[in-house]
């Protein structure tokens, strides 16, 4: 019986695998790439590394400097990316900014000087715009300089009061022309009312005299007198409304017809 030599014969007749040619740009491993990472173009630090993510082009690989914590691209310009560089690190950067400005030793010199200036300024140095405007108005008004002392002018309450008084004085001056016309009209109306009251008193007296002589006269004569008196009232009312004009002045009611 022949020995079993199938396994050996299979190994002898096995064909060798062909060797594949790998391009040179694929031969560089990640370790070799990390070793050959160039120095940082900003701080010249050799503490740099190759970025495995966010590399959009193999011809221009992206690197990161651990010293200044900035990214740059080989063959390109230096990118001014803040610490972390990603949107996921934004909350951390905000917290760092709050912590950084929470103490004076971590703040810039300009901010420290500004804060010190604001704190060192006395409270009385603040400018009150309302008081300045009131003082400006009082300086322009003619009535604001009367009956004032040095202590009253310094107080903001006094200056505000004078400003309101000057404003009301200007408004009254502007409306004097219109108020003059209305004043003359009111005077004329008042005179007309007084004349009407006087005329009504005379009519009442005439009627009382007629009723006194009622016992001496007949009913027919009394009726004629009453009819004549009432018929003359419209004419008298029209005549009492007539006015005499002498130049530009209005005279009172002409009551010569009534024996005044």
Swiss-Prot record:
<keyword id="KW-0862">Zinc</keyword>
<dbReference type="InterPro" id="IPR003851">
    <property type="entry name" value="Znf_Dof"/>
</dbReference>
<dbReference type="GO" id="GO:0003677">
    <property type="term" value="F:DNA binding"/>
</dbReference>
<protein>
    <recommendedName>
        <fullName>Dof zinc finger protein DOF1.2</fullName>
    </recommendedName>
</protein>
<keyword id="KW-0238">DNA-binding</keyword>
<keyword id="KW-0539">Nucleus</keyword>
<keyword id="KW-0479">Metal-binding</keyword>
<feature type="zinc finger region" description="Dof-type">
    <location>
        <begin position="38"/>
        <end position="92"/>
    </location>
</feature>
<feature type="compositionally biased region" description="Basic residues">
    <location>
        <begin position="87"/>
        <end position="101"/>
    </location>
</feature>
<dbReference type="GO" id="GO:0006355">
    <property type="term" value="P:regulation of DNA-templated transcription"/>
</dbReference>
<feature type="region of interest" description="Disordered">
    <location>
        <begin position="83"/>
        <end position="124"/>
    </location>
</feature>
<dbReference type="InterPro" id="IPR045174">
    <property type="entry name" value="Dof"/>
</dbReference>
<keyword id="KW-0805">Transcription regulation</keyword>
<feature type="binding site">
    <location>
        <position position="40"/>
    </location>
    <ligand>
        <name>Zn(2+)</name>
    </ligand>
</feature>
<keyword id="KW-0863">Zinc-finger</keyword>
<feature type="binding site">
    <location>
        <position position="65"/>
    </location>
    <ligand>
        <name>Zn(2+)</name>
    </ligand>
</feature>
<comment type="function">
    <text>Transcription factor that binds specifically to a 5'-AA[AG]G-3' consensus core sequence.</text>
</comment>
<feature type="binding site">
    <location>
        <position position="43"/>
    </location>
    <ligand>
        <name>Zn(2+)</name>
    </ligand>
</feature>
<keyword id="KW-0804">Transcription</keyword>
<feature type="binding site">
    <location>
        <position position="68"/>
    </location>
    <ligand>
        <name>Zn(2+)</name>
    </ligand>
</feature>
<dbReference type="GO" id="GO:0008270">
    <property type="term" value="F:zinc ion binding"/>
</dbReference>
<dbReference type="Pfam" id="PF02701">
    <property type="entry name" value="Zn_ribbon_Dof"/>
</dbReference>
<dbReference type="GO" id="GO:0005634">
    <property type="term" value="C:nucleus"/>
</dbReference>
<dbReference type="GO" id="GO:0003700">
    <property type="term" value="F:DNA-binding transcription factor activity"/>
</dbReference>
